[in-house]
Regions:
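N-terminal metal-binding scaffold of metallo-dependent hydrolase/deaminase domains
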Residues: 1-35, 374
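Active-site metal-binding motif and surrounding structural segment of the metallo-beta-lactamase
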Residues: 33-47
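Active-site gating loops and adjacent loop-to-helix segments of metal-dependent hydrolytic enzymes
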Residues: 61-92, 164, 197, 215-233, ...
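Histidine/acidic residue-rich metal-binding segments in metalloenzymes
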Residues: 124-138, 154-261, 277-300, 356
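His/Asp/Glu-enriched, well-ordered alpha-helical/loop segment
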Residues: 200, 221-232, 268, 272, ...
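Alpha-helical scaffold segments that flank or form the walls of functional sites
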Residues: 63-114, 120-135, 160-167
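C-terminal cap of metal-dependent C-N hydrolases
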Residues: 349, 360-405
Length: 405
């Protein structure tokens, strides 16, 4: 049994409103039943751990193996396919561990990682990420979404491997309809498998800036038909940024009614789209602010780090929130708090985490900032000073110190 008393805790912008929180057996409690250690935060800001809803650990950190020239989605898929031919379980594990090390020290305590499944890679990536899931459970909760990056119906053998991974415990089933000759057929088949295995769904969807040819309607229809509300997420959906206001709001209301959730991946989506424009290049991001206003559960996430989909990244969700706020011209305190929620509380809602937060009964996953307010964390891209998973300290960061003459 372990217990901790957190004193002089600040939960918002009011520096005078300091609180005391109690942690016992890895959860926040109203009072302690045993002696405890005390952590005096001296007025530092405490927030619940950040939640990464969409990342690819298996293909991270491979830029040195790729030749980038066009910077398009098609090139990214092709270059990754070529690099994937040399992936080993040890290699995937080592690169995934690099990202997890960064993510943990950036304050992430829960992560959904997508893992590619196809006849070329087989279950190599999946097995490596399962090992990471076990080895890093002390600091971060990993859930695995297996998906057919290379297509499903046009890639024989893929479905059998997906089913094998699901039977082995993969928590989520993903999709990538635009890689199949018949995107709608892939969507329908994945819904059938999701029902068979009782899994949530997470699609890569509508990933360009052409408003024509959207498949979002088929996802909405299947969600209604099969009663999968709250269990379906669509990522990217950059086509939404090309819709006029009235059309967008109609789609947003349909998403909200169906219970389909949306994840925006700002770094990747900005890097890969709009290259056909020399001037007046669009800011092709899913407009979360408008979707949220219509009742859609939304999140922001990293997607890729150090590969042809996104050649950069430090696994900071705060940086992604700041990037989205900047590009989307969101700057008021309320808007910045909403951006923060899309990497924390709303992300937890999207992943259906049952015990997220800072109230009694919630898991004691939290991070500490030297920032004047939660909104300032996003505005200033503040790095967390320390983090805890289930009441156990997982990292600390030394504060910079000026050396005046």
């Amino acid at each position: 049994m372990s217990a901790m008393t957190l004193t002089n805790v600040r939960l918002g912008a009011d520096a005078q409103a300091l609180q005391t929180l109690y942690v016992e057996d890895g959860r926040f409690v109203t009072s302690l039943s045993t002696a405890s250690e005390t952590l005096d935060l001296q007025g530092k800001l405490l927030l619940p751990g950040l939640v990464e809803t969409h990342i690819h650990l298996d293909k991270a950190c491979i830029m040195q193996r790729c030749q980038l020239s066009e910077g398009t989605l098609a090139e990214a898929i092709a270059q990754t396919r070529a690099a994937k031919a040399d992936f080993t379980e040890a290699d995937v594990y080592q690169r995934g561990a690099q990202v997890l090390d960064k993510a943990i020290t950036q304050g992430t305590t829960h992560m959904r990682t997508h893992v590619e499944i196809d006849p070329q890679i087989g279950l190599i990536g999946f097995n490596a990420v399962r090992r990471l899931q076990a080895d890093y459970a002390w600091a971060i909760s990993l859930e695995i979404c297996v998906f057919p990056q290379e297509g499903l119906l046009n890639n024989p053998g893929t479905e059998g491997l997906l089913c094998e991974a699901l039977a082995m415990g993969a928590e989520v089933l993903g999709g990538c309809p635009y890689t199949d000759a018949d995107p709608g057929a892939q969507i329908r088949r994945l819904f059938e498998l999701a029902v068979e295995f009782d899994r949530d769904l997470d699609f890569h969807l509508d990933f360009d800036l052409n408003p024509e040819g959207m498949t979002i309607g088929e996802v909405i229809r299947c969600t209604h038909q099969l009663g999968w509300a709250g269990r379906v997420t669509i990522g990217h959906v950059t086509k939404l940024s090309a819709l006029p206001r009235d059309t967008l709001l109609a789609v947003a209301e349909s998403l909200a009614e169906a219970g389909v959730q949306v994840t925006c991946l700002p770094s990747t989506d900005l890097f890969l789209t709009g290259r056909e424009h020399f001037h007046n290049r669009p800011r092709g991001l899913a407009p979360l602010q408008h979707l949220h206003a219509c009742g859609v559960t939304c999140s922001l996430s990293t997607n890729n780090i150090g590969n042809p989909f996104t050649p950069y990244g430090d696994a900071s969700l705060v940086r992604q929130a700041n990037l989205f706020a900047n590009v989307s011209q969101l700057a008021t305190e309320a808007e910045l708090l909403r951006c923060l929620s899309w990497v924390s509380s709303e992300s937890a809602r999207l992943l259906r985490l049952p015990d997220y937060g800072l109230t009694p009964g919630c898991r004691a996953d939290f991070i500490v900032f030297d920032a004047p307010s939660p909104a300032a964390v996003v505005a200033e891209i503040s790095p967390p000073l320390m983090g805890y998973k289930a009441g156990r300290k997982t990292f600390e960061r030394a504060q910079a110190r000026l050396l005046r003459p």
